[in-house]
């Protein structure tokens, strides 16, 4: 069974905690019923702050440094591959990257660049292919050598921000007993760092499996 710790991407702005809890619960109930509420979605944006905003990640098309990062790290390399024929086997992708920069910039406007975030450490040491780079591949806890079963199984539970910090504390407590190596201390330390980083900033995760 797979598992990703999908980070809660928003939290309540100070003073709006109760309303935030009400709105998020109402939206969750509506989604379960296949319904939508644009008004509630808009209100949620106003009373919440994103994880990206919290760590100071700049935005493509809005902040110059993020725009240049997108040009140099995404657009220019991909367009060079397209012109060199490396994308000939994927004609739609080739056509996509051969478009003018301004056109693609408009489509990606507002995209956050975590690599340039003011506060470093938010990206996961291990991430799944179906989630974002800030979501931790929780399934890897199953492969930490010597980790007791109770702490492994807890990975499959949703965690609030406070619970993330507590989980990290308990994992850190057993870290000295874990063997060295990429499937030992290194892997567990990555999980601890991720839990502490986001939990201490007010963000929890939901277990997606």
Language-model features: locations:
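Acidic (Asp/Glu-rich) sequence patches and key acidic residues
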Residues: 1-201, 208-209
């Amino acid at each position: 069974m797979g598992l990703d710790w999908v980070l809660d991407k928003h939290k309540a702005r100070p003073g709006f905690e109760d309303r935030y809890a009400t709105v998020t619960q109402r939206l969750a109930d509506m989604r379960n019923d296949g319904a939508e509420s644009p008004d509630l979605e808009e209100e949620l944006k106003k009373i919440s702050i994103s994880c990206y905003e919290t760590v100071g990640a700049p935005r493509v098309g809005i902040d110059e440094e993020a725009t240049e990062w997108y040009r140099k790290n995404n657009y220019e390399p991909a367009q060079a591959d397209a012109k060199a024929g490396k994308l000939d086997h994927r004609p739609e992708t080739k056509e996509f990257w051969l478009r003018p920069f301004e056109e693609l910039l408009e489509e990606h406007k507002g995209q956050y660049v975590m690599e340039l975030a003011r506060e470093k450490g938010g990206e996961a040491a291990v991430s799944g292919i179906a989630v974002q780079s800030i979501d931790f591949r929780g399934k890897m806890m199953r492969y930490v050598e010597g980790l007791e079963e109770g702490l492994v199984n807890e990975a499959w539970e949703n965690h609030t921000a406070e619970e993330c910090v507590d989980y990290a504390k308990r994992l850190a407590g057993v870290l000295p007993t874990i063997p060295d190596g990429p499937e030992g201390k290194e892997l567990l330390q990555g999980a601890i760092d991720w839990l502490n980083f986001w939990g201490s900033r007010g963000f929890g995760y939901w277990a997606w499996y």
